[in-house]
Amino acid sequence: MQRLLLPSLRALTGSRNVGLLVPRVASRTQCGSSCGSQRPLRPGQYSTITEVALQSGKGTVSLPSRAAERAVGRWLLVCSGTVAGAVILGGVTRLTESGLSMVDWHLIKEMKPPTSQEEWEAEFQKYQQFPEFKILNHDMTLAEFKFIWYMEYSHRMWGRAVGLAYILPAAYFWRKGWLNRGMKGRVLALCGLVCFQGLLGWYMVKSGLEEKPESYDIPRVSQYRLAAHLGSALVLYCASLWTSLSLLLPQHKLPETRQLLWLRRFAGGTAGLVFLTALSGAFVAGLDAGLVYNSFPKMGESWIPEDLLTFSPVLKNVFENPTMVQFDHRLLGVTSVTAITVLYFLSRRIPLPRRTKMAAVTLLALAYAQVALGISTLLMYVPTPLAATHQSGSLALLSGALWLMNELRRVPK
């Protein structure tokens, strides 16, 4: 029996030493004639700590805990990549002003695009009933409409693919028993956040389809809803990436010194600053604030422009005044790169593993590359390819910050 089972177990676990995981059996000489036949010991008495048990009733095999962790970690790493793709594609959709081309939302029905001329004409006529066509695109042709429609369609279909990438493997791993209690709660939260993200996306689009006389006759989605949509996507990305790194990368046993404690806290604060800077970019995009002052380092002829606080009450300027929004994004960007530079030099004063040092160097390089992209995007009046690259850079920078934080995390006792 053992000869029959070992090849299957080795194929599943990818280990040549699977034979060590088969339970010992009591011999007839140890238990006497009363045993009758050989009986396996209890599951807790396996010859190694990690258990591999055949469940003959269900026909499934439980992988060793480490192998299961790596499988779940790889899955979540792929999921974080799909979320990054959705964020980038959503940014391009916004930059090409395509987000309001699909004026309704159906989970299943809209998965089939128009195919005939009549269907396209009907879709175009629906779009013509809304402010964006009436005010901005009244001379748009059907061919131009097809382009922006397919941009929004691609973003929505990608979002559905992200949902499937989370939910289907989660159900599979859950059924196989490869998720412990803590991981089950985390996976449920991630899947719930994916569903919430889809609903939030439509809630955002609806704000751009409404008549808004106070919006200076420029149809656009609410910058608040845009920031919420991007923010929830970033939270989903960060949670997925952090969990995957924690499962895939061996944890360092670092000496718990005061210097390391301060470095760990500073790295966490820096990551939070990078997240806030990326989130502020949603307000820049929502208000087209990148086109207000296209000079650097000054804003026009001054360091602090005169129209910085023109709205009343004053707090309204932070979220609705394009000048203030651009000023805040600049300030957050400069503060972030300064904090990352300080973090890098602090890390050089502490003996750290090679992989941790590599994470610090990578984060520093990503920070200066992102600053260069941001300045170039500003000076060139926000061209779509460069602006999309700048948004992608924010994800890369956030990933670098999370990687370094993960390298410095405390080993549980």
UniProtKB/Swiss-Prot annotation:
UniProt-annotated location(s): Mitochondrion inner membrane
InterPro entries: COX15/CtaA_fam, HemeA_Synthase_type2, Peptidase_S1_PA
Mitochondrial intermembrane topological intervals: 93-156, 208-229, 293-329, 381-384
Cofactor: heme b
Record's signal peptide: none
Keywords: Heme biosynthesis, Iron, Membrane, Metal-binding, Mitochondrion, Mitochondrion inner membrane, Oxidoreductase, Transmembrane, Transmembrane helix
One example of a Gene Ontology biological process annotation: cytochrome complex assembly
Membrane topology designation: Multi-pass membrane protein
Segments on the Mitochondrial matrix face: 1-71, 175-186, 251-271, 348-359, 406-413
GO molecular function, one term: oxidoreductase activity, acting on the CH-CH group of donors
PANTHER family: CYTOCHROME C OXIDASE ASSEMBLY PROTEIN COX15 (PTHR23289), CYTOCHROME C OXIDASE ASSEMBLY PROTEIN COX15 HOMOLOG (PTHR23289:SF2)
Family: Belongs to the COX15/CtaA family. Type 2 subfamily.
Identification of the protein by name: Heme A synthase COX15
Organism the protein comes from: Mus musculus (Mouse)
